[in-house]
Amino acid sequence: MLIVADENIPLLDAFFQGFGEIRRYPGRSLDAASVKDADILLVRSVTKVDRQLLEGSRVRFVGTCTIGTDHLDLDYFAEAGIRWSSAPGCNARGVVDYVLGSLLTLAELDGVALPERVYGVVGAGEVGGRLVRVLHGLGWKVLVCDPLRQAAEGGDYVSLETILQQCDVISLHTPLQRGGQHPTWHLLGQAQLAQLRPGAWLVNASRGPVVDNVALRELLLDREDVHAVLDVWEGEPQVDLTLADLCTLATPHIAGYSLDGRQRGTAQIYQALCRFLGVNEQVRLAELLPKPPLAQIELDASTDLSWALATLCRAVYDPRRDDADFRRSLSDDPQQQRAAFDQLRKQYPQRREIEGLAVRLHGEAPQLAQLVSALGGVLV
């Protein structure tokens, strides 16, 4: 059996060497010739998998180590009888950590208290839903917009207009849909961006085209009160250099790039391939993940809640480092800039997640205990 895989998928040998030969390629350069003889194709979001890539090949199974599937032509898969799997929720916790770290940075810049802001989450799937649960656990006010879930479940969902008009912070976590009843391509265009409240913060860690980047650039040129945090970009790996300069935080599509999340994605498509082939799983992710470098954090019962929040989050991840690395990589040479974008992702340092972080409290501190629990930490 021949497996063709994106070279940046972690733990390829550990999970897949027992199935046959593995050939690795840069994800953006995968073409029909590369996959012609493959039985299994393993990709990330940078590879468009469609009729043009697969027609005439032997591919029977496609696995993507990502939550999103907008790079997969699922209609063609159905037509051609190709089975597929994504990795839902694999990097959700990493994205939540990214959002929390970004909020801490913005709060320090603006001198505001995070519990006093109103949060709007657009898209309540694996990532957005996890973020909503964390924010609710912290006791913060959260409004949620998700028309698909609202139609299926009812509940306390609000419109996008309500989010724009009432929320100080808007975090986007939608898939990219260009058609259908609820398209998300340019979900925030010029008209929507104009409705942002004074001093609003906008975070996009979903897909670049969910926000009209040209309209956002023009807004930021006109409104210094608005902060934008972008991890995803229209046309990436090419980036609008002016827009990047105007963003308070700018990063190269790494919000979900925790070590745990990336390896979890590989494990999930391994499990799906085992089901497809009808074989038992022989490899367990828990046996492959290294121990976290930070064994435990200790807090005194008198610790200020805001200080504890910042300490716990930044002990695991601080997006300011990624922002600085990204800005240093930006170049007026388009080819050099695209290469640097991909290189930052390829050589991304190991980063763990807050979830599971061991925390010891000295003394009775119910509010601190609640904060630790909301973040996903474990009291020891």
UniProtKB/Swiss-Prot annotation:
**Which Pfam families does the UniProt record give?**
2-Hacid_dh, 2-Hacid_dh_C, DUF3410
Q: Which UniProt keywords apply?
A: Cytoplasm, NAD, Oxidoreductase, Pyridoxine biosynthesis
Q: What is its EC number?
A: 1.1.1.290
Per the record's keyword annotation, is NAD included, yes or no?
A: yes
Residues annotated to bind substrate: S45, T66, Y257
The record's CDD domains line, in alphabetical order, gives:
ErythrP_dh
Q: Which reaction does it catalyse?
A: 4-phospho-D-erythronate + NAD(+) = (R)-3-hydroxy-2-oxo-4-phosphooxybutanoate + NADH + H(+)
Binding annotation for NAD(+): D146, T174, A205, S206, R207, D231, G256
Q: Name one GO cellular component term.
A: cytoplasm
Query: Which pathway does this chain act in?
Result: Cofactor biosynthesis; pyridoxine 5'-phosphate biosynthesis; pyridoxine 5'-phosphate from D-erythrose 4-phosphate: step 2/5
Annotated compartments: Cytoplasm
Which stretches are annotated as coiled coil? none
Catalytic residues (positions): R207, E236, H253 (proton donor)
Q: Does the keyword Cytoplasm apply?
A: yes
Family matches, as HAMAP family: PdxB
Physiological role: Catalyzes the oxidation of erythronate-4-phosphate to 3-hydroxy-2-oxo-4-phosphonooxybutanoate.
Its assembly, as annotated, is:
Homodimer.
The protein's name is Erythronate-4-phosphate dehydrogenase
Q: What species is this protein from?
A: Pseudomonas putida (strain ATCC 700007 / DSM 6899 / JCM 31910 / BCRC 17059 / LMG 24140 / F1)
Phylogenetic lineage: Bacteria, Pseudomonadati, Pseudomonadota, Gammaproteobacteria, Pseudomonadales
